[in-house]
């Protein structure tokens, strides 16, 4: 009964007590070979790769971990992998494997040979109505599938629509997507992934694929440094190994196995670990020097092809990759020791053995199929977080670096780096090769920064996240050293690329909004004179948003007593800000915010002390605090926006309480930091205790910030006697407003929805807005809000300025224009969805359940299976240069 029987030589039969099973394992990136690069996006590059065992073609998206850490995009990479892993739809690109190495993440997806719709649009100019309707229908089905499973794409555009070999559309590039799954993927999520009504074998996944898709993505890269909690433990472990034999013995007992001892004692006495990113050129030189990467053993002892090509600074020409981040374009310190030692060092067996050990320790993705421990794996079956997490790898790499230091000759830096060299060589903790002056001269470039190998960078050279860069004052173009000249405004093509929207772009919108309010001043008594901020393009965005939104709400918040008082208010504001550096608005806050009992300044720390506080019961403690669901409160706080144009009524209208909320008590002077002073964005707090009676006041406070708190805890009924000064502004509130989840605006300017620009809470409606933009672009050839600069694009979006074609041969049909109108609705609650599109006359006669089988207008005709010419039109139009390499 399931027991294997074996027959011996004498014919007797015996029962075998063991049965061997093949344990499924995810594949290694070594099993894929690069064919050619395909395209490049904002956060990664895509390559055409071939599986070595079955010659099947895949599209491999390579994302650098250090790049994602520097851009603060770690969570977005995780969201992209999860969104693709959870999706099984004929209109969404299929993800096969999710692999990773020490420096990169590899998403192995299906290869769609037809290219992207953006390239096809550049070739066609524009699509006819039938072709555009078919494409929009398939994309609408994909969006509906994603939204039903809690996924918002948030970067929908023709660039992210791929064409299959039969001409059908599939969505890709979920790098900015939002997944409601608040945990890591498990096997049940992959196995029970919702699919079509009749699942096909095309959507089934092998055990190796499932294991790779549920694996945790580790961003503890050697280049970026280990940032997780295991850093201290691993550091202590390495220090223990390098200190005394007693601690080394203790570590051996913990891992329950004997480790290879280091043959050179000087390696254990060296300085702390060196970043792997700087060791890659040395490794490549050593490979060339000793010629150990033969054809028979290349896949076993050498770096993987993808790892060496994508991780090495030598792989790409920096001049060809001008749009890459400065971190990867910076020049490296040349290792002259390897160049000098080529003619001096013998290529003996010991050197070759050391190189093998170095490469074996450096690459964590080799020797996956054998029973040996790859990447110095211990007997517990768990790989270390990084290849340098063990003492063996650390010692081997240092040994290779220190071997020839006695033969090196001191050389001087150029004048640009001479000061830095003296600073590090004079330190007692500096590495021996710096102490001996054995650093090769660097050919300094005035437009690049230099990163020293093995030396911790200064603060000025540390890569900063986008939020940290916004905290600094704006610099001029001459302050930045770039590989190419930059203009005052980006070119028109840049509005079609994915980017992070800075406050610099949004500040121009506020200026135009203030100008518009000034023009309407004489017509409406509820709008006061606009107040222009001092420096909208510098300082912290949180403080600017707080002040701008307070100004916008207060200007529509009631009748100003007199014009002279407003002018007097401005004079005092300018005097205080120029003398003390603080924007003190005493009378302004007194008059404009005197009606608000609890504004955003006290929301984090203070309670409303009302005599008739409502008792919290199990019946009412689940009531949401959003007063927009209450018709009584909504009618009470309805603002007067009838004087505004129809296109701006829904955008600029804010349900801020007007003069109906009266409070006879005057508030004290409130001080805000200056616009130019840096503010710590992370030093904010969530609301802790809010009474149930202040629901209406909470509503106004939340509208000031354009978001809602993550959690609101009602206050206890007992009176706390520690609150003696309920109107004191807490210190942390002066540093900015409540931190919201979606503070950054990421996306392509032409396709952003108005609620994203206004930093309001958003949902799946942002994808339907982008679909309306795509429909207009399909029929006309250009996006409806396209302009010269991103700020002008944003202004067109908020104004809903759509340039409808007027000529006879280019005019859109009534049904097409109506479909665009219902998709490009400012109010996200009234925006059309799949149900509305199915009932629209433009899509009349469309067989929605059989879309994947309908004949398409365009069917790719490639020269061969590796033809990538359908991707070139978009790359050339957007000036994207895909780096080449030698196979």
From Swiss-Prot:
It holds the Pfam family Pkinase. GO terms for cellular component: centrosome; cleavage furrow; cytoplasm; nucleoplasm; nucleus. Residues 844-887 form the AGC-kinase C-terminal domain. The keyword Protein biosynthesis does not apply. This is Serine/threonine-protein kinase greatwall. Coiled coil: none annotated. Residues 588-604 have a biased composition (Basic and acidic residues). It comes from Xenopus laevis. The active site is at 155 (proton acceptor).
């Amino acid at each position: 009964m399931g027991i294997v029987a074996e027959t011996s030589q004498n014919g007797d039969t015996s029962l075998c007590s063991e049965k061997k099973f093949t344990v499924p394992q995810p594949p290694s990136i070594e099993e894929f070979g690069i064919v050619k690069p395909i395209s490049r996006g904002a956060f990664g590059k895509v390559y055409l790769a071939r599986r070595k065992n079955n010659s099947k073609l895949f599209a491999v998206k390579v994302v650098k971990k250090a790049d994602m850490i520097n851009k603060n995009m770690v969570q977005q990479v995780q969201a992209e992998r999860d969104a693709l892993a959870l999706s099984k739809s004929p209109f969404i690109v299929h993800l096969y494997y999710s692999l990773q190495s020490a420096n990169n993440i590899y998403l192995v997806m299906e290869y769609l040979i037809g290219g992207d719709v953006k390239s096809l649009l550049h070739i066609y100019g524009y699509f006819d109505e039938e072709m555009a309707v078919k494409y929009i229908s398939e994309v609408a089905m994909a969006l509906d599938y994603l939204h039903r499973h809690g996924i918002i794409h948030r970067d929908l555009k023709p660039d992210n629509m791929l064409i299959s070999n039969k001409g059908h559309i599939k969505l890709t590039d979920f790098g900015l997507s939002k997944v409601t799954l608040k945990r890591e993927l498990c096997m049940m999520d992959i196995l029970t992934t919702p699919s079509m009504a009749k699942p096909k074998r095309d959507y089934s996944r092998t055990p190796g694929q499932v294991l790779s898709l549920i694996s945790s993505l580790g961003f503890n890269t050697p280049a970026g440094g280990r940032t997780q909690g295991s850093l201290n433990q691993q550091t202590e472990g390495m220090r223990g190994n390098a200190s005394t034999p007693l601690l080394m013995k203790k570590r051996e007992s913990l891992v329950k196995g004997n480790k290879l001892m280091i043959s050179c004692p000087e390696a254990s006495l060296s300085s702390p670990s060196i970043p792997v990113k700087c060791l890659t050129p040395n490794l490549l030189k050593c490979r060339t020097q000793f010629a150990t990467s033969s054809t028979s053993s290349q896949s076993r002892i050498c770096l993987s092809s993808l790892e060496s090509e994508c991780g090495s600074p030598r792989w790409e020409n920096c001049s060809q990759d001008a749009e890459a981040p400065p971190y990867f374009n910076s020049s490296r310190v040349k290792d002259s020791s390897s160049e000098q030692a080529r003619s001096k060092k013998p290529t003996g067996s010991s050197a070759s053995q050391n190189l093998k050990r170095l490469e074996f320790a450096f690459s964590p993705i080799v020797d996956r199929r054998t029973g040996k421990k790859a990447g110095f794996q211990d007997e517990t079956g768990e790989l270390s977080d990084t290849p340098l997490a063990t003492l063996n790898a650390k010692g081997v790499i240092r040994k290779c670096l220190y071997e020839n230091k006695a033969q090196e000759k001191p050389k001087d830096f150029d004048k640009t780096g001479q000061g830095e060299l003296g600073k590090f060589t004079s330190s007692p903790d500096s590495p021996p090769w710096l102490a001996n002056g054995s650093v090769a001269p660097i050919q300094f470039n005035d437009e690049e920064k230099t990163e020293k190998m093995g030396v911790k960078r200064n603060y000025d050279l540390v890569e900063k996240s986008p939020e940290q860069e916004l905290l600094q004052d704006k610099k001029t173009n001459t302050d930045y050293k770039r590989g190419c000249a930059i203009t005052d405004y980006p070119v028109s093509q840049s509005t079609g690329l994915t980017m992070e929207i800075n406050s610099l772009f949004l500040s121009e919108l506020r200026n135009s909004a203030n100008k518009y309010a000034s023009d309407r001043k004489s017509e409406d008594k509820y709008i006061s004179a606009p107040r222009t901020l001092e420096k909208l393009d510098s300082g912290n965005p949180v403080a600017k948003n707080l002040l701008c939104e307070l100004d916008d709400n207060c200007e529509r918040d009631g009748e100003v007593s007199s014009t002279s008082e407003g002018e007097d208010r401005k004079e005092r504001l300018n005097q205080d800000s120029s003398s003390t550096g603080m924007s003190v608005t005493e009378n302004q806050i007194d008059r404009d915010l005197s009606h608000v009992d609890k504004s955003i300044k006290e929301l984090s720390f203070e309670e409303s002390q009302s005599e008739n506080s409502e008792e919290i019961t199990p019946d009412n403690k689940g009531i949401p605090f959003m007063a927009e669901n209450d018709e009584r409160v909504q009618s009470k706080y309805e603002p007067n926006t009838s004087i505004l144009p129809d296109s701006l009524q829904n955008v600029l209208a804010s349900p801020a309480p007007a003069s109906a909320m009266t409070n006879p008590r005057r508030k004290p002077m409130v001080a805000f930091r200056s616009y130019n002073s840096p503010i710590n964005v992370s030093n904010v707090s969530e609301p802790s205790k809010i009474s149930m009676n202040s629901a209406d006041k909470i509503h106004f406070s939340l509208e000031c910030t354009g978001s809602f708190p993550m959690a609101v805890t009602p206050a206890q009924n007992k009176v706390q006697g520690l609150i003696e000064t309920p109107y004191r502004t807490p210190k942390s509130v002066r540093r900015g407003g409540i931190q919201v989840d979606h503070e950054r605006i990421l996306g392509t300017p032409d396709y952003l929805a108005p609620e994203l620009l206004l930093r309001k809470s958003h949902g799946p409606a942002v994808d339907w807005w982008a679909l309306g933009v795509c429909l207009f672009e399909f029929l006309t050839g250009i996006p409806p809000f396209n302009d010269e600069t991103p700020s002008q694009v944003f202004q067109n979006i908020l104004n809903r300025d759509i340039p409808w074609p007027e000529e006879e041969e280019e005019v859109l049909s009534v049904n097409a224009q109506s479909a665009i109108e219902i998709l490009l609705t400012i109010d996200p609650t009234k925006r059309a969805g799949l149900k509305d599109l199915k009932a629209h006359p433009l899509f009349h006669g469309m067989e929605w359940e059989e879309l994947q089988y309908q004949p398409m207008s365009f069917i790719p005709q490639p020269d061969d299976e590796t033809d990538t010419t359908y991707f070139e039109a978009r790359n050339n139009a957007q000036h994207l240069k895909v780096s080449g390499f030698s196979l």
